Amino acid sequence: MAKIYYDEDASLGILAMKTVAIVGYGSQGHAHALNLRDSGIRVIVALDDKSPHRKTAMEDGFSVYTTSRATQEADVIMILTPDTVQPAVYKECIEPNLTPGKAIAFAHGFNIHFGQIVPPKDIDVFMVAPKGPGHLVRWMYEEGKGVPALISIHQDATGSCRDIALAYAKGIGATRAGVIETTFREETETDLFGEQAVLCGGATALIKAGFETLVEAGYQPEMAYFECLHELKLIVDLIYQHGIAGMRYSISDTAKYGDVTRGDRVYEAVKPLMKQMLKEIQDGEFAREWILENQANRPVYNALLNKDKEHLVEKVGKELRQMMPWLSGKELK
């Protein structure tokens, strides 16, 4: 079983005389910065001069510097920019300003695990990854609670990296809930697999396959949308709150019987494909493909996204959502 750390396992004292730089001020960045500051830690924010978040960070009372300057000033640098821009930001602004004994930190292991960022041997490298969006991290902190997080030590140059990482996790409120020890490899590979096989790729493919099956059989697209997409939230919310068994407790016996007698057909069909997807993540094939795709300005990425935007389920959904006053009515673009 995993090693889990709580409040009593961490001390903020090790950060008392240090400065933490938060690189980025988006969903996670603003939550980390505010929570750390409220925990008594000196925090500065690193943003490009043209960043739309610069004004917000300043209004929140932070000193805002360029990433180069912030790296010079800080002892701990948490990099919370998107994965795809991190290597360039690191190479241009962070690496030249690192000195022995500093620490860099991440909330996702992609660039370290796949070698897109290779830190010098004389600095600490760790990860603190909350398992929830930034607004939840902030809200739970303000409520005196916390969001569980992952922690990993990639490189301990000072001998104090784990203590620094745990202090950081405590500063954002994560140790109130529990911090699970992992590795950069495990976090990266499981995160990518979950996104591809279940949460994003798997879920959207299942929705489209179900929708198309009903429409091709002559059923109205509106009915197919309700049964294969709209009602998914009801089930996912139950699973999220109570687990699979708890969800089954809340649905009809007919739905339950169909679940346990027919669901295995999908299971048996997709599990071998999931294993292949995991292999492509483990051997670096997906990472190489994604890195090259970005270097080529994302032609396949953009083409596939645009193709899916034209799917009938999108047209039908847009019309049906206008009938639902409890939704915002504002379409995301």
Swiss-Prot record:
Q: Which Pfam families match?
A: KARI_C (PF01450), KARI_N (PF07991)
According to UniProt, the reaction catalysed is:
(2R)-2,3-dihydroxy-3-methylbutanoate + NAD(+) = (2S)-2-acetolactate + NADH + H(+); (2R)-2,3-dihydroxy-3-methylbutanoate + NADP(+) = (2S)-2-acetolactate + NADPH + H(+)
Q: Where is the KARI C-terminal knotted domain?
A: 183-327
Q: Mention any one GO cellular component term assigned to this protein in its UniProt record.
A: cytosol
Supply the InterPro entries for this chain.
Answer: 6-PGluconate_DH-like_C_sf, KARI, KARI_C, KARI_N, KARI_prok, NAD(P)-bd_dom_sf
Enzyme class, UniProt record, top EC level: oxidoreductase
Query: Which annotated residues bind substrate?
Result: S252
Q: Which domain of life is it from?
A: Bacteria
For this UniProt record, give its keywords in alphabetical order, as a comma-separated list. Answer: Amino-acid biosynthesis, Branched-chain amino acid biosynthesis, Magnesium, Metal-binding, NADP, Oxidoreductase
Quote the record's cofactor note. Answer: Binds 2 magnesium ions per subunit.
Q: In which pathway does it act?
A: Amino-acid biosynthesis; L-isoleucine biosynthesis; L-isoleucine from 2-oxobutanoate: step 2/4; Amino-acid biosynthesis; L-valine biosynthesis; L-valine from pyruvate: step 2/4
NCBIfam families the UniProt entry points to: ilvC (TIGR00465), PRK05479.1 (NF004017), PRK13403.1 (NF009940)
**Per the similarity annotation, which family is this?**
Belongs to the ketol-acid reductoisomerase family.
Q: What name is this protein filed under?
A: Ketol-acid reductoisomerase (NAD(P)(+))
Organism expressing this protein natively: Hydrogenobaculum sp. (strain Y04AAS1)
